[in-house]
Curated annotation (Swiss-Prot):
Native organism taxonomy: Bacteria, Pseudomonadati, Pseudomonadota, Gammaproteobacteria, Enterobacterales
Active site positions, chain numbering: 200 (cysteine persulfide intermediate)
Top-level lineage group: Bacteria
Reactions this protein catalyses: uridine(34) in tRNA + AH2 + O2 = 5-hydroxyuridine(34) in tRNA + A + H2O
Record's protein name: tRNA uridine(34) hydroxylase
MF (Gene Ontology): oxidoreductase activity, acting on paired donors, with incorporation or reduction of molecular oxygen
Keyword Membrane: no
Length: 350
């Protein structure tokens, strides 16, 4: 029988990836389309991806597919062709190629079936997810940014917005996409007569959000084709000014792609200009936060003196303290209190 799940330890896989000599290309893509049998599709696609040495994170649901992966450079075109011929709905699918890439974004292939490819919390049976807003290409985005009648809405989470966003874009303060959707409707009521432009990292969240806004009575709704990644790529290729400021947070080991030279965030410990996310080195914490090199040295990669002290304890004592603890895996959020329960590297489907 074919192998449909990874059977090698994470440590072994990571060491193997780091020892690879061939460069890898980090790619993200998504597609909203009907999948009649997500589990069957998942198993078939897993075999295709495994044969091409693809690593990464892939979600499938009845509503489509959402993927962030890395592919050996010599196999990118083969991957593209096999993906396009796997299902007619995937033929010609746009692949977002990473803007900054060291090829070390993933080291294992995880492919899961979920209820939704993005957790939206929508349970309204009358909602039509296909009734989306109009696409905007790079040149159109820059025109809209200069339009006083347009309002840009960032459909990413607070830790993403903190390190980079479009000029004057509104933040919808929330920890998850499902929390953002009702807040966006509420916050934008006063802008109902404006042109609403929504964006996210690669397009998947803002596409669904645009449909949700239209469902709630907003008529002038656009979203950026391919999200921040494709916008920056096209703007650079066409010699256009790149109007995104700062860094684009990404959901893999890189944790960010530099878009502009500006550093708009600050170290969460000392306040110095910094936009580098990290996870607290204390395995009982793993807080996602921004830390400058000086504080990383001072606190040994930890988020606090308490975690620094705990990290210095014997491993057995650290394990004892971690046992049954419920306050690990958190994200720093200045807008809603210091700690909020989450994954170390947040789940892009949330």
């Amino acid at each position: 029988m074919p192998v449909l799940h990874n059977r090698i330890s994470n440590d072994e896989l990571k060491a193997k990836m780091l020892a690879e000599s061939e460069p890898r290309t980090t790619i993200s893509f998504y597609k909203y389309f009907t999948i009649a049998s997500p589990q069957q599709t998942r198993d078939a696609l897993y075999q295709v991806f495994t044969a091409l040495d693809v690593f990464g994170r892939v979600y499938l649901a009845y509503e489509g597919i959402n993927a962030q992966i890395s592919v050996p450079q010599s196999k990118v075109e083969t991957f593209r062709q096999q993906l396009y011929t796997f299902d007619p709905a995937l033929d010609g699918l746009r692949l977002n190629i990473a803007l900054e890439d060291d090829g070390k974004s993933f080291w294992v292939l995880r492919m899961k079936v979920r209820d939704r490819i993005v957790a939206d919390g929508i349970d309204d049976p009358s909602f039509d997810a296909s009734n989306v807003g109009d696409y905007l290409k790079a040149a159109d985005v820059n025109e809209m940014l200069d339009d006083p009648d347009a309002v840009f809405i960032d459909m990413r989470n607070h830790y993403e917005y903190e390190v980079g966003h479009f000029e004057n874009a509104l933040e919808i303060p929330a920890d998850t996409f499902r929390e953002q959707l009702p807040k966006a409707v509420e916050m934008l009521r006063e802008h109902a007569d404006k042109k609403i432009v929504m964006y996210c990292t690669g397009g998947i969240r803002c596409e669904k959000a645009s449909a949700w806004m239209k469902h709630n009575g907003f008529n002038k709704v656009w979203h950026i084709e391919g999200g921040i990644i494709e916008y920056a790529r096209r703007a650079r290729a066409q010699g256009l000014p790149v109007r995104f400021i700062g860094k684009n947070f990404v959901f893999d080991e890189r944790m960010g792609e530099r878009i502009s030279d500006e550093v708009i965030a600050h170290c969460h410990q000392c306040g110095a200009p910094c936009d580098s996310h990290t996870n607290c080195k204390n395995d009982g914490c793993h807080l996602l936060f921004i830390q400058c090199p000086q504080c990383a040295s001072k606190f040994n990669g930890c988020c606090s003196e308490q975690c620094c002290e705990e990290l210095a304890l014997p491993e057995e004592e650290q394990r004892r303290r971690r046992a049954g603890r419920e306050n690990g895996n958190k994200i720093f959020n200045k807008s809603r209190g210091r700690l909020n329960s989450k994954l170390s590297i947040p789940d892009p489907a949330e």
